[in-house]
Amino acid sequence: MTQTIRFFLLVEAATFIIAALIHMGFFVTGYEHRQARVAESVIAGVLFGGLLLSLFMSDWTRNVAIVVQLFALLGTLIGIMTIIVGIGPRTVPDVVYHVAITVVLAVGIAVARSAPADSLQ
């Protein structure tokens, strides 16, 4: 179960890094957005930090994963709100990414919550 939780953290963090790079103008142009880039970079850093912490403190994996994914989910929901009110980027890829990563984060949280705390060492 520990490896599955870590896999979720790695994939989630990687997608936020890719999103931040896209909002920097890497890979494709026309999607630059400074505030989105900053938010995605912070979320990626928190998720990577949680992953690293789980590697060094494996008995903390479950709780750390829940906390960092909840943080990422909150940030994503704020991003969705900025799209709805018109301050965030409103492109189709942005909307699709926000919906998809919300689902992935929710599943990741459910997986971490379902893991027995004593089985993660």
Predicted segments with their positions:
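Topology signature of small-to-medium multi-pass alpha-helical membrane proteins
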Residues: 1-121
